[in-house]
Amino acid sequence: FILNPDVIIHDDILPQMAQWLLDHPGVVMATPQLYFPDGRIQNLPRRKPTPWLLLARQLAPRFGGVMQKADEHYTMQDEDLTIPRPIEFCTGSFAAIRTDVFKTIGGFDPEYFMYVEDADLTQRALRQGLVYLLPQFTATHAWHRDPMRDAGKFKMQLKSMGRYFKK
């Protein structure tokens, strides 16, 4: 399991998620539905990042319109996320990944300090099998979008995105 320190696990889901993965051998990585501490859903299941979708993600809050529609597509708001389903980008804040797959793909790329490392890991895991959202399992994540508030972190995110798209 990959867990950020700001994740609160509900209902002893780790063994349940592990069993779900054992029961579904074609799935190599999965994430539960994450919620903010106030109970709102975090829209973390995503499609494969593209430069356009990441730009739209950053600009949607300010400009809406086509940027908002692209962001909703990127965050899969046009899909039924209440049932287990394949996804293309598994958040690194809480993910279950098969140990053999994690070892085969070499774990996290050490060239990423922060940001986009989870997208990279997901894309390499997808070469080994399916990646799933498991909304029947839930956790709370006290997530903050720091890059938009801190120029240094935003620069770090841009550097990571550049590396990701060069791969």
Predicted regions and their residues:
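Short, hinge-like loop/turn segments at secondary-structure boundaries
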Residues: P45-P51, D150-G152
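Short, flexible, basic/aromatic active-site loop/helix in glycosyltransferases
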Residues: P49-I87
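Catalytic donor-sugar/metal-binding loop of nucleotide-sugar-dependent glycosyltransferases
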Residues: R85-P86, A95, T99-F113, A119-T140
